[in-house]
């Protein structure tokens, strides 16, 4: 009778999965209506068995990203679609770090809803579908090759870091301007930026914590229980008052720019005191030259830096300071993206495609 017990167990598991999928489908529909006015693009719903087959049961050999600092961020796996009638053969599969619950289900469904409407933009991952049946919900993206998580220790080229900054600024600007109700990304993390192995394009993912700003308003105020994120990237108005606006993203991006130029270790050496935002600015002024600020790994890769490129790095720092509010009015992300695009264009034309 052992075979009968196994058959009964499989039937129970299948029934539980179907119930979970049905319940979560309702939550997803509510989030699509709430966040996207019901206009999300159609996506494929994968079964749990299809996901297990695509990832070889989430094998370690298929994992793209590891845990960061022992904090359980989302796990990414490469996978193959074995359906010969489906166009997307290579897949990137994101296994959500938490089990789906009444408390966090809205975040997961928001990730799906917003991912679906930004999929056509080159600086976002293209969403193929999702799996609502699994205990840990899953998102499925199209992948040309195996993408990698952004690791500043591996990205040592100045031009590549400049390109990443321009592409993420463009992604944030798109969220702020492309929809009737602007989206604020809110919680920027290096772990949510993936690099396409085929062309090195930086892509922003994970919209779990996005906030939409009502039409005619410039901010929303969150309750204390909703305030969260990486402390480095949180401006005081958000951290203390729960105010979320486009400036929330500008601040986080300004910190991201500084980490791109300095590297994580040097950033924390210069910017350890968040009680005084001028700490970095003052320390930078005491530095004798740009060499004392820029990531040493990147400088080693560059070799001799031209005076023109040093000036461009200085301008990059100044732009980051504007984003975090140290130099007058905080710029819109559209302006930041345009400025970075100019930096990138000037760097390419003046230095060619080799030295940096």
Swiss-Prot record:
Q: Which GO biological process annotations does it have?
A: cell surface receptor signaling pathway
Superkingdom of origin: Eukaryota
Q: Where does ATP bind?
A: 68-76, 94
Q: Start and end of every Protein kinase domain?
A: 62-356
Q: Name one Pfam family in it.
A: Pkinase
Family of this protein: Belongs to the protein kinase superfamily. Ser/Thr protein kinase family. ZRK subfamily.
The protein's assembly and partners: Interacts with RPP13L4/ZAR1.
Q: What does the entry's free-text domain comment contain?
A: The protein kinase domain is predicted to be catalytically inactive.
What name goes with this protein? Non-functional pseudokinase ZRK15
* Species this protein is from: Arabidopsis thaliana (Mouse-ear cress)
């Amino acid at each position: 009778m052992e075979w009968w017990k196994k058959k009964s167990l499989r039937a129970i598991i299948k029934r539980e999965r179907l119930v979970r999928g049905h319940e979560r489908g309702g939550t997803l529909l509510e989030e699509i209506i709430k966040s996207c006015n019901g206009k999300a693009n159609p996506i494929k719903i994968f079964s749990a068995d299809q996901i297990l087959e695509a990832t070889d049961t989430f094998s370690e050999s298929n994992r793209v990203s590891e845990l960061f600092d022992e904090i359980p961020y989302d796990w990414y796996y490469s996978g193959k679609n074995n359906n010969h009638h489906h166009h997307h053969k290579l897949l990137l599969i994101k296994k959500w770090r938490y089990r789906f619950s009444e408390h966090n289900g809205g975040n997961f469904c928001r990730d799906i809803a917003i991912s679906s409407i930004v999929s056509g933009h080159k600086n976002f991952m293209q969403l193929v579908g999702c799996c609502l049946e699994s205990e840990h919900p899953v998102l499925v993206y199209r992948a040309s090759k195996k993408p990698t998580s952004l690791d500043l220790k591996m990205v040592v080229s100045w031009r590549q870091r400049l390109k990443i900054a321009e592409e993420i600024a463009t992604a944030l600007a798109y969220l702020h301007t492309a929809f009737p109700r602007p989206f604020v990304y809110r919680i920027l993390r290096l772990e949510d930026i993936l690099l396409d192995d085929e062309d090195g394009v930086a892509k922003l993912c994970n919209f779990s914590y996005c906030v939409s700003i009502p039409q005619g308003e410039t901010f929303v105020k969150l309750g204390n229980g909703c305030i969260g994120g990486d402390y480095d990237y949180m401006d005081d108005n958000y951290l203390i008052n729960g105010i979320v606006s486009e400036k929330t993203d500008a601040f986080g991006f300004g910190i991201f720019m500084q980490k791109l130029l300095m590297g994580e270790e040097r950033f924390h050496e210069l910017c350890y005191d968040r009680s005084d935002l001028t700490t970095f600015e003052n320390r930078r002024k005491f530095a004798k030259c740009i060499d004392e600020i820029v990531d040493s790994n990147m400088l080693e890769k560059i070799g001799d830096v031209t005076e023109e490129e040093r000036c461009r790095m200085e301008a990059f720092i100044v732009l980051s300071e504007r984003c975090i509010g140290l130099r007058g009015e905080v710029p819109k992300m559209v302006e930041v993206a345009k400025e970075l695009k100019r930096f990138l264009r000037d760097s390419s034309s003046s230095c060619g495609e080799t030295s940096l």
